[in-house]
Amino acid sequence: MLVVELIIVLLAIFLGARLGGIGIGFAGGLGVLVLAAIGVKPGNIPFDVISIIMAVIAAISAMQVAGGLDYLVHQTEKLLRRNPKYITILAPIVTYFLTIFAGTGNISLATLPVIAEVAKEQGVKPCRPLSTAVVSAQIAITASPISAAVVYMSSVMEGHGISYLHLLSVVIPSTLLAVLVMSFLVTMLFNSKLSDDPIYRKRLEEGLVELRGEKQIEIKSGAKTSVWLFLLGVVGVVIYAIINSPSMGLVEKPLMNTTNAILIIMLSVATLTTVICKVDTDNILNSSTFKAGMSACICILGVAWLGDTFVSNNIDWIKDTAGEVIQGHPWLLAVIFFFASALLYSQAATAKALMPMALALNVSPLTAVASFAAVSGLFILPTYPTLVAAVQMDDTGTTRIGKFVFNHPFFIPGTLGVALAVCFGFVLGSFML
């Protein structure tokens, strides 16, 4: 039966990959329907994860319409054009900190055209900085103070003596170090010379490659204000999470959990941005960030539900099979997280589906925290929105998906980044936890 269920899950994901975009969420729902038809009980839908993403996307979309995203992209472009030789290193650093700031990797979508353009002008294969930038944004989700994944992980680890601040003190430096080392390795080990790529040369001869140059962006009057309002919201979430933390003991009985606090604060930020920056709410619905974010929510709804259905109905088999192995080789937990995240399509959904199982197997808090970064394997299957966008934005043809699905330019940098983040997590965690 397990084999049949796995085949259904893989076929649903394959269909979703063929449909593309929001279609993977649709196919996930179809997969759950087929599993239910053969007697498998549907799993849990990660509504708390989806609600956090929706609230954060609403605030970011309001900021985008107010001009805040253009302002951030403009600052990014200035940084990259001042240091074009280091594009493969700087691009992932930029997307890392933007994701830390926003709590969602969708914010990096706005920077991808700039990264691709600067790379072309410098004669660097766009696939190098684009791949490291996309992967960096995915890894940064496991370090953002307001991401659904970190908020959930914090709530789980509180009962094991790991506070919100302790968690951040490990995941932020370990993931940042991993991104830096991964970027250096990609720069040194792979040929980045654009003129050496035969597909690029062919497309150039056919006139399919265009150099657009630096775009002049008109920054709206409320742009900086919208960025500061969003930053204020992020700080508010962090402060509340610290105050709310049982290990801090500042509040005996908190009024609400951190998830609800994020929803309230982010919706309030969206309201203040709309009022103070005079934003037309109709334009928010039509913004690229809102569309991408809501599409991601549907994808997570379908795929995470499909993945949780499979995992929850086979949890005993997973425990029996993996229990002794993980206790003897704790690092294998990271491997399980890594491949499961490709099926569950969300860092938070993966943590929510598998972290309780890991802790039930008496995995140490250090192993759980260090392995947390491994839930960032969303790049394994080339279907995630930021990954697909990077492929579409590169008109040189260097960022392409191979015939065998897994042979794409994101796989090696991503695997390197995740492996390094886990290793650094074990090292730093042994000192800090």
Swiss-Prot record:
GO terms for biological process: anaerobic respiration; C4-dicarboxylate transport; L-aspartate import across plasma membrane. The chain crosses the membrane at residues 1-18, 20-37, 54-71, 86-103, 133-147, 229-246, 265-282, 293-310, 333-350, 356-373. Its main location: membrane. Active under aerobic and anaerobic conditions. It is a multi-pass membrane protein. GO terms for molecular function: C4-dicarboxylate transmembrane transporter activity; succinate:fumarate antiporter activity; symporter activity. One of its GO terms (cellular component) is plasma membrane. Keywords: Antiport, Cell inner membrane, Cell membrane, Membrane, Symport, Transmembrane, Transmembrane helix, Transport. It is found in: Cell inner membrane. It comes from the Bacteria. Induction: Expressed constitutively under both aerobic and anaerobic conditions. Expression is only slightly affected by the growth conditions. Residues 38-53, 104-132, 247-264, 311-332, 374-433 are periplasmic. Residues 19, 72-85, 148-228, 283-292, 351-355 are cytoplasmic. It catalyses: fumarate(in) + L-aspartate(out) = fumarate(out) + L-aspartate(in); fumarate(in) + succinate(out) = fumarate(out) + succinate(in); (S)-malate(in) + succinate(out) = (S)-malate(out) + succinate(in); L-aspartate(in) + succinate(out) = L-aspartate(out) + succinate(in). Disruption phenotype: The growth the dcuA-dcuB double mutant is severely impaired during anaerobic growth with glycerol plus either fumarate, malate or aspartate, whereas single mutants are either unaffected or less affected, depending on the C4-dicarboxylate. The triple mutant dcuA-dcuB-dcuC is completely devoid of C4-dicarboxylate transport (exchange and uptake) during anaerobic growth, and the bacteria are no longer capable of growth by fumarate respiration. Mutant cannot grow with L-aspartate as the nitrogen source. InterPro entries: Anaer_Dcu_memb_transpt. Belongs to the DcuA/DcuB transporter (TC 2.A.13.1) family. Responsible for the transport of C4-dicarboxylates during aerobic and anaerobic growth. Required for the uptake of L-aspartate as a nitrogen source during aerobic growth. The uptake of L-aspartate in aerobic conditions is coupled to the excretion of fumarate, resulting in the net uptake of nitrogen without carbon uptake. In addition, during anaerobic growth, catalyzes the uptake of fumarate, malate or aspartate coupled to the export of succinate. Can also catalyze the uptake (without exchange) of fumarate. May play a a general role in anaerobic C4-dicarboxylate transport. This is C4-dicarboxylate transporter DcuA. It comes from Escherichia coli (strain K12).
